[in-house]
Amino acid sequence: MSRIGKRPISIPSGVTATVEGQLVKAKGPKGELSYVVNDEVLVKFEENVISVMPRDQSKDARSKWGMSRSMIENIFCGVKDGFEKRLEINGVGYRAALQGKDIQLSLGFSHDVVYKVPSGVTVTVPKPTEIVISGIDKQQVGQVAAEIREYRRPEPYKGKGVKHADERIFRKEGKKK
């Protein structure tokens, strides 16, 4: 039994939701999103509350039950408040700068890395060592943050690289004589 899936989803104020078969649409102050729920899961819409139930008690249906509920809740949070991820850049000479809509990263390579920002996501660089990624789609914001971090992951000896703002790097001790 999914403990996450059992909880009903209340629609926040300022957000309108429609359910058409397996398609859930949400429209709010930040924009509009939709999510196609898996066929194994049944969606019911009653008076500002959406409930999600598995069609049968198979293991496959129950495994998709909680995920579907979380995805629907994420689209409501996204169109109301949006999502934001912060990245920090550590290292001598490591920096980021906006170049039009793209982001230019100096990460210690012989060339600068230019990352093309997809539509639906906005990237700002308040400081050369900080990147703020925001948008209404949680998956897309996280994907952009992961792709930028992947160019130079933080290394464990000095902590140089791109890391999430709330991430702790496990530091190792260097060689001993």
From Swiss-Prot:
Gene3D superfamilies: Ribosomal protein L6, alpha-beta domain. It comes from the Bacteria. One of its GO terms (molecular function) is structural constituent of ribosome. Keywords: Ribonucleoprotein, Ribosomal protein, RNA-binding, rRNA-binding. GO terms for biological process: cytoplasmic translation. Pfam families: Ribosomal_L6. Residues 155-177 are annotated as: Disordered. One of its GO terms (cellular component) is cytosolic large ribosomal subunit. Part of the 50S ribosomal subunit. This protein binds to the 23S rRNA, and is important in its secondary structure. It is located near the subunit interface in the base of the L7/L12 stalk, and near the tRNA binding site of the peptidyltransferase center. NCBIfam families: L6_bact. Belongs to the universal ribosomal protein uL6 family. This is Large ribosomal subunit protein uL6. It comes from Bartonella tribocorum (strain CIP 105476 / IBS 506). The lineage of its organism: Bacteria, Pseudomonadati, Pseudomonadota, Alphaproteobacteria, Hyphomicrobiales.
